[in-house]
Design a protein with these regions (language model features):
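Short, polar N-cap/turn motifs at the start of nucleic acid-interacting alpha helices
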Residues: 254-255, 275-298
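Solenoid-like repeat scaffolds
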Residues: 9, 52-53, 140, 173-184, ...
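A short, glycine-centered helix-capping/turn motif at helix boundaries
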Residues: 145-146, 155-174, 272-276, 286-288
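Active-site/catalytic core of tyrosine-dependent DNA strand-transfer enzymes
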Residues: 206-265, 270
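Basic, Lys/Arg- and aromatic-enriched nucleic-acid-binding interface segment
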Residues: 116-164
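Conserved tyrosine-mediated DNA breakage-rejoining catalytic core shared by Y-recombinases
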Residues: 131-137, 169-211
Length: 299
């Protein structure tokens, strides 16, 4: 992680964790050491070959990680390897953008797909089951898991769904102004987000939440001894984004993640809007950008 920090001091904490994890997993998969930039450069051909099996959407992030890691190496091969990685990454970005414009589900997303109505039905059934539990003074381990799932889904469904990181870093107590937390100001409850993927660009975000969600969080604070909103399966530490995803997979019995939930939410909300590719093609034919085209639309 030190190399990433030294090479890119402005990298967010989330990106540092992601890049460090990518490098460790890559070394494990290739069964080689990738502890230094020079070792990455040494094994660059093996890495490139290995990454051919990775979808462009994921590969571009792995390549960005590798470029940051080796970019200040004194090796004579650094420039050539960076050029190779960057060319592949730019092709992946182009291909990914093309796929995004098509607005088609990946095979993995198709496996996890549910309608918003189906998701809300599961949530409603869970709510009925845990309502008596939320009134208890203390929970068993199993009861805790059920209630925690209810809290998580409440956060994802009662307001527009955010990424996993936003809630794995959310604190119930012992927080500072720089933490993700709930704030009640002039009797109005808010979620405050400081740690999230695009925080460097947008800064602190304040999301007004419904009273129902605020009540759920207050009740949960009394039942959950941890300072964090969500605990891992052993209830010994805060949950990680990967563990949160696994919780959702287990509950819905399919690969439904926060990412897919965001797709489902937006697809339902904007279901009457024309396809993105069609809108871009029309804007191009009219000689202006998509942004300008949207400004022309009057409702």
């Amino acid at each position: 992680m030190n190399t990433f920090k030294e090479n890119r001091p402005t990298l967010s904490a989330g990106s540092l964790r992601t890049y460090t994890s990518i490098l460790k997993n890559l070394a494990k998969q290739l069964k080689v050491s990738l502890s230094t930039p020079e070792e990455v450069i040494k094994h660059s051909k093996e890495i490139t070959e290995h990454l051919k099996e990775v979808p462009p959407k994921l590969r571009k992030t792995r390549l960005a990680c590798l470029i940051v890691f080796i970019e200040k190496s004194d090796s004579k091969q650094t420039e050539a390897v960076i050029k190779e990685f960057r060319e592949c990454m730019m092709n992946d970005i182009k291909e990914y953008k093309s796929e995004v414009d098509k607005q088609e589900l990946s095979e993995r997303q198709k496996e996890g797909m549910m309608t918003l109505a189906e998701i809300m039905k599961k949530y409603s059934d869970l709510e009925k089951a845990v309502t008596p539990l939320m009134k208890k003074d203390k929970l068993t381990s199993k009861e805790f898991c059920h209630c925690q799932m209810y809290v998580l889904l409440s956060c994802l469904l009662l307001i527009p769904p955010r990424r996993s990181l936003d809630y794995t870093e959310f604190k119930l107590r012992n927080f500072t102004d720089e933490c993700n937390h709930m704030l009640v100001e002039k009797r109005v409850p808010y979620f405050i987000f400081n740690t999230y993927k695009t925080a460097k660009k947008y800064g602190q975000q304040r999301e007004k939440i419904p009273n129902k969600l605020a009540t759920i969080i207050k009740t949960w604070t009394n039942l959950n001894p941890s300072e964090y909103l969500l605990q891992n399966s052993k209830q010994s530490n805060k949950i990680s984004p990967t563990q949160l995803t696994n919780l959702l997979h287990s509950f819905f019995e399919r690969p439904l993640s926060t990412s897919l939930l965001r797709h489902i939410y937006l697809s339902e909300k904007y279901k009457d809007i024309p396809a993105l590719k069609e809108m871009k093609d029309t804007a191009s034919a009219m000689g202006h950008s998509l942004g300008v085209a949207l400004e022309y639309i009057k409702r």
